[in-house]
């Protein structure tokens, strides 16, 4: 429950209030109204809902339908002149976050908050942290892959970082469930559209940075992308940063006055010895660790999570056990065919993560290697060039381009945009399942491998804005073992 008086106080304190408009009347105050729900979905309103009219695709007709359902008040940057009072603000997204925070009783104050950002590795690092903290704490987790608000029941996530109304509702539920910690992935988009506006994290972790999410509906430039990634550092009480990341000196300077730990090359916290399924660390986490996820980058993610959890009350024993227990759906999952050939399923979906995936596989598989790859439609358009240029560096790999969440674009046209930057041959098979079957049928020995990149554990394809039925890469591959 929240009163309109409190709503207006919050907006005015944030310098985000313009006025209240109803017909020809303009006001700066209002009294005697209470709201028992918040919503940005015009299909889920009641007379006591405070509704937020947001988004480029929002239409006046949505508001009119909500009024038919009894809506009596809304917040907007625009006066839609629909006959009910409108609280006009400068920034609707800022308003949503601060009002949701208040409506749910500031649940963040009752949780220790850990956030991961980076171009890749956020989900893996979040899972490491979850498994570490669950040894002696009660963590909830919001990840790109799955969400748990009670530490036991998992459900599929819709966004890397939820909309602020959903985020604070989830936090409140986690508190109600007795959780003590919350692990989150915080995307650059979350800061771009202010889903975490006003929120301070106890520990923020910056894993890495490389060009991604650059396009008409995301970030216009790499500089803008990097800036929004770095905002997590400004909004965290303590930070963990990868000393081996590109542009590290920029971040190092930014966090110099904060409580911080660095890990990786040139830092105290390094991996001194590394094998496929174990590694040895120096510094605060000094010791030997078993790990299920192969690849040096996964070992670095484990170190980042361990350092963060150490600051949040985990013991070294918790960290050892949690790292050893961690596996992640759709991340470096390995199947073995009857002929001994390996199938690697991974969520790698940008140039840098695909390169690391290929390099790890080539360390272990010396025979014929197939790569199944696509690029999503209507987002991350810079990936297409990145993929094309990257694949030129691996002429020994057989490449099959295919559909990967084409959305409202033609998968064949996306493949041609990738090919435009390639100086080598590749095949195109529209149907993703057929592409997987074809590649697996052409392997013949334990030295061979099929790499299926992009979708990980996603059991759908995004086509024309909807989630179309698809079994998922891992399940499809299992059918042809």
Swiss-Prot record:
One of its GO terms (cellular component) is cytoplasm. It is an enzyme of class 6 (ligase). Pathway: Cell wall biogenesis; peptidoglycan biosynthesis. A motif (L-lysine recognition motif) lies at residues 404-407. UDP-N-acetyl-alpha-D-muramoyl-L-alanyl-D-glutamate binds at residues 42, 160-161, 187, 195. It is found in: Cytoplasm. GO terms for molecular function: ATP binding; magnesium ion binding; UDP-N-acetylmuramoyl-L-alanyl-D-glutamate-L-lysine ligase activity. Disulfide bonds: none annotated. ATP binds at residues 118-124. Keywords: ATP-binding, Cell cycle, Cell division, Cell shape, Cell wall biogenesis/degradation, Cytoplasm, Ligase, Nucleotide-binding, Peptidoglycan synthesis. Carboxylation is probably crucial for Mg(2+) binding and, consequently, for the gamma-phosphate positioning of ATP. It catalyses: UDP-N-acetyl-alpha-D-muramoyl-L-alanyl-D-glutamate + L-lysine + ATP = UDP-N-acetyl-alpha-D-muramoyl-L-alanyl-gamma-D-glutamyl-L-lysine + ADP + phosphate + H(+). Belongs to the MurCDEF family. MurE subfamily. This is UDP-N-acetylmuramoyl-L-alanyl-D-glutamate--L-lysine ligase. It comes from Streptococcus suis (strain 05ZYH33). The gene is murE.
